[in-house]
Amino acid sequence: MLELTHVTRRYGAKPAVSDVSLTLSPGKTYALLGPNGSGKTTLMKMVAGLIRPTSGEIRFDGQPIGPATKAQIAYMPTESYFYPYMSIEDAGRYYRDFFEDFDMERYHATLARMELNPRDKIRALSSGMNAKVRLALTLSRSAKLMMFDEPLNGVDILTRAQVVDEIIRSRREGRSMLISTHLVDELEEHIDAAICMKNGVLARMGDRAELVGEGTLTDLYLKIYGPAGREAASDAEAGQV
C-alpha cells in the first residue's frame, strides 16, 4: 500500500529524515515512535504530500505521492490551522470544499459523540477541544490511510479516552492507520506494528509481538530511547559493540 524507498529530507545541510525505506500493509495500525526531533512529523508530512523528499521515492498504491493520492491519505497535524474567527462548522465546510471524500454527516455525528458544538468559535476552544475538532475532521474522510500526529498530546484523561474511542471506531472499518504518539500505553492493545525513528533514521520496525516479546511498547520505547539505548548507541559509535 504505502512504500518509502531510500527517502531523505534535509533542511539545509541537516537531514530530518535519512535514507528511510519501509512498507505499510493495508488494514494494519502502526505506532510511529520516537522522541521529539526524531523525524516523525517530517515523515508524515512527506507521506501527506505537504513537503517533498530531498531524495528517494514515496508511493501509495503504486502511484507517486501527489494530487492522485490526496483522496487516499488523511493527516491530522499537531498544530491548529484554522482562523480564530471560524466556527467548528466553518472548519467542516472548509474540509468539504477541499476534500471530495469529506462526509459532513459523519463529521456532525463525530462532533456530537465528542460533545462539541458546531457553532463554537475556534478561538474559544481549549487545546483539548481543538484536538478533538482536528480528529473529527480527519476521521470524516474516507481515506484508506489515516495518519495522526500526537493525537493525545496536551489533552486531559477524559479527552484522551474520547480520542482513543474514535480512533478505534474508525480502525474497525478496516482502514490503515499510522499514529505518532509518546503515550503508547493508551493504544497498546490496538497496535499491530511499530516503526521506531531515532535521529531521522529508521531504528527498528516490525510486528508488535515480535518487537516487544513478553514486554510492552513502553518497554520497547525505554529500551531504544532511554539511558540504556543511548549508552548502546554511544558504544556502537565508539566501536565497542
PLM regions and their residue ranges:
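Catalytic Walker B motif of ABC-type/P-loop ATPase nucleotide-binding domains
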Residues: 146-150, 155
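Helix-to-loop junction immediately C-terminal to a conserved catalytic motif
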Residues: 48
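ABC-family P-loop ATPase nucleotide-binding domains
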Residues: 78-133
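Helical segment within the ABC ATPase nucleotide-binding domain
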Residues: 160-173
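Conserved ABC transporter NBD signature motif
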Residues: 56-69
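The feature captures the beta-strand-to-loop junction immediately N-terminal to the Walker
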Residues: 33-35
